[in-house]
Amino acid sequence: MINKIPKHEIGAESKAISKIVFDTVELAKNHFEIVKKRFLDVNSWELFAGKNKAKFTLRNQEGELILNQPKVGNYISIEVPLLPNKDKDHFEWVKIEVYEEEKKEDYEAIYIRVRPTSNPTNATDETVHFLDSKATSNFFIRRNEMEISAEIYAINEIPNFEDKTISEKIRNKAVALGGMLFGSKLQWEGLTDGLIRREK
């Protein structure tokens, strides 16, 4: 599934990878079931990422909160701390464009790819996100025998200046550059660590 990640061509890129190894395949299989539940509960990602991180909410094509397993065509609204955008609900928006699962005896994985998009509750198709729609975030969880990993690859990250006012451009550049330099990596490392963490 790693070959599903779009080629990096422009802007910044980053990755966060967290791994955990178990003593037996059976223990790894059991824990991966927990990891899957966490991963597929998008509305709880902020709990796993830690304090003062972005809030993620899974939504349908009307922009309404949903509690289902994510699928292609669903939206995710993102509430960025400190610097909300000027849209009416202050959310950043991404859309799920790829969802795949793979399961074999010694290997299983789930892959989700999202891309900045418009607000589904607005009439315009203007991208409502601090990053340009060329950017993608690629989320993996996988079990390879006794090893479990959670991985996030952020690709082609450039600020979104499409049809923006000067103040919006400044805001998007500030948030995007902050994310490129340190924010996104801290956000994603918190999430990957939280997704695979052993329960006490």
Question: Where in the sequence are the language-model features?
Answer:
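Short, solvent-exposed secondary-structure boundary/capping segments
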Residues: 100-117
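Mixed-charge, low-complexity intrinsically disordered regions
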Residues: 1-72, 81-88, 126-200
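Short beta-strand-centered aromatic/proline hotspots
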Residues: 88-102
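Short, well-structured alpha-helical interface segments that form or flank functional binding sites
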Residues: 71, 91-94, 109
